[in-house]
Amino acid sequence: MRDRVTRGASRRALALFGACILVAAVALLAPWGTPRAEACAFDPWRPDAYEADQQRTRYTAAIDAASVNRLLPTDPFFALPPIERGTRATRTNGTPFIPAALLKAIAWTESTMTQAARAVPFDSAGPAQISFDCGHGIMQVTTGMTTPLGADGTPSARQASIATHFAYNIARGAQILAEKWNAAPDQIPVAGIDTNSDPAILENWYFAVWAYNGFTGPGASISNHPADPQFGAWPRPAFNCDGTQSRTRYPYQELVWGCMARPEMRNGVPIWPAQPATLPDLTNQAMARALSVTNWTYPYSNMDIPTPQPAHLIQPPANIQSSAQLLGAPVFQTSAQRITLNVNATGAASKGTVRIRNGGTGVLTWIATTTDRFLVMSPPAGVAIGSDLKCVGAEACPDGTLTITINPTLLPASRASGTIRLSSPNGGGQAIDIVVDVSAEFSIGAPGTSRATP
């Protein structure tokens, strides 16, 4: 179980340890714009994110809206595209729709439906959840999150939104799943050749869910092929989604099917209503033939399958909250617009802080960027929480805090000024420039070196 717990002393100890590591690492950190191998978009730092309630009611409401393209419908980067349907030869566009229960089960399988790191309590804010392979947040969005995509090699506003804000993360994950569905028949097989591949039929999402984690098979480092010998004989016990079974014994889509039918409980209430779904029956000769590993050959045209039976026709969720209710109306505000930092003769630098406030409602995302390589910022992006949301028990609540210090080895002179640009993708208003004046008690020698002033 990956639920958060509030452990004040432990969190303070972790924070102190992290601060020590931060101070020790400052001089070694590569600034944005410097190539880094195997890094994520915000490396070496981690943005802050908001973690909502333990019951995940805000997240499941956002998923309901995303499933019918009512979460961020006017933003092409986050909106659902038309969902194709039809056989391999007759695909046509249809209404944007994904079964909400499927998205909820994927969110649980990916992250236990959490946006922030495990140590962050519910109803709070803190470091975002980022996996070893750059999966971000609730939907573990990896696509577009492995390198900075903004100007001058800095992270983009979209990347900040995905990393910090649950709604944008959910919307992007839903769009990626829709793109996997629409990849049939060119890149993945078609499920539901006998039901016009109707996306309202839950079982027809089998290949798209497989592809969400990676359309991989035998020979891959992680295979999701149901007939891969590593998973044993069929039928196998259903995945229970309760932490008692090894996930490595199942292909990804069977993990999702198991969680969809057996949601976790919190406070005696399931996170979402249980929704059974039928897997392809590999004891059925036609189904086993289609899903034989001998057919694992691009373009997978021999892997098309009929809808597994019994099939489940899914209706859109009832009582969907509006985008305005889920997103609120954030208002971007900040404190100081000029700060002064000092660096003593030993190279130790003072720190400055800038508070980012949300004068409205909902979750405000902010991002800080600079092209001045001697400025070190932490976190590089974060959140500020509006008056309508509960946010307690953390240093990052309700305001965001940007901490600024100096890498003295990169100072261009003993007296220097740099600029940090603060902006909000969803808070309106203009970007705000923070001027940082630096005074060092040593003179600068060759580039990248310094010496104490006598």
Where are the regions that the model predicts?
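Secretory targeting and sorting signals
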Residues: 4-35
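Short, functionally critical alpha-helical segments immediately adjacent to catalytic or ligand/cofactor-binding
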Residues: 79-88, 94-122, 141, 208-213
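A short beta-strand micro-motif common to beta-rich folds, especially ectodomain repeats
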Residues: 352-354, 402-406, 412-426
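Short, solvent-exposed loop/turn and secondary-structure capping segments
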Residues: 116-129, 221-225
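Non-catalytic cell-wall polysaccharide-engagement segments
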Residues: 37-70, 132-135, 142-329
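C-terminal edge beta-strand
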Residues: 429-441
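Beta-sheet-dominated interaction scaffolds and their linkers
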Residues: 321-359, 442-454
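Surface-exposed binding patches on compact interaction domains or structured appendages
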Residues: 328-338, 359-403
